[in-house]
């Protein structure tokens, strides 16, 4: 069923790679964050549609769709364009994308309204289909001096695991505020700062 006139829809997209092999890797922080949101909201049902795993919930009269492309990271845009076209979405207003960023320290998040891919292949794929103007939440996974591919496809180490719940809670709160508060500038000011030392 396509979007009805005046019906508000928001899509919260988490990027990652499908399959057990990747589910606990740093590159899958987008999937992990979306699953955490679904858990907090008691959303258990998930179905396959638009080459993605999809679930939804009505929040304050707005349909919110939680969306995990199953195309593998580099083809994420193929999945995203399907739901954008189906619901006739405006990417600038209706989409939030959560993904990993090696250029940010572990635990930092940055909100952006638009921009380039920054070398992230999932974002590059999405941009190729819908352009650069969509809100994204970049989640820092650090990189240090490690090989980039080895780092992003590696699992969180013990130190990172200890902090992960707190970081996911921060992402969760950020998304909830985005869905309920219209003042994105205020939200960006709140979250776009380096994390304090985690306890």
Locations of regions flagged by a protein language model:
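Nucleotide and nucleotide-moiety/phosphate-recognizing core
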Residues: 2-113, 124, 128, 133, ...
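Extracellular serine-dependent O-acyl
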Residues: 139
């Amino acid at each position: 069923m396509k979007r009805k006139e005046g019906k508000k829809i928001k899509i919260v997209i988490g990027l990652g790679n499908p399959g057990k092999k990747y589910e606990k890797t740093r590159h899958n922080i987008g999937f992990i964050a979306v699953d955490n949101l679904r858990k907090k909201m008691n959303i258990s049902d998930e179905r396959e549609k638009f080459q993605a795993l999809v679930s939804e919930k009505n929040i304050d009269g707005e349909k919110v769709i939680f969306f995990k492309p199953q195309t593998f990271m580099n083809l994420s845009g193929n999945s995203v364009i399907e739901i954008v076209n189906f619901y006739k979405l405006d990417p600038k207003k209706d989409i939030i994308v959560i993904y990993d960023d090696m250029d940010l320290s572990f635990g930092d998040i940055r909100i952006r309204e638009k921009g380039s891919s920054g070398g992230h292949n999932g974002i590059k794929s999405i941009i190729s289909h819908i352009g650069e103007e969509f809100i994204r939440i970049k989640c820092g996974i650090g990189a240090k001096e490690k090989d980039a591919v080895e780092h992003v496809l590696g699992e969180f180490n013990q130190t990172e695991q200890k902090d992960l719940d707190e970081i996911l809670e921060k992402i969760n709160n950020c998304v909830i505020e985005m869905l309920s508060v219209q003042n994105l500038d205020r939200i960006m000011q709140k979250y776009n700062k380096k994390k304090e030392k985690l306890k």
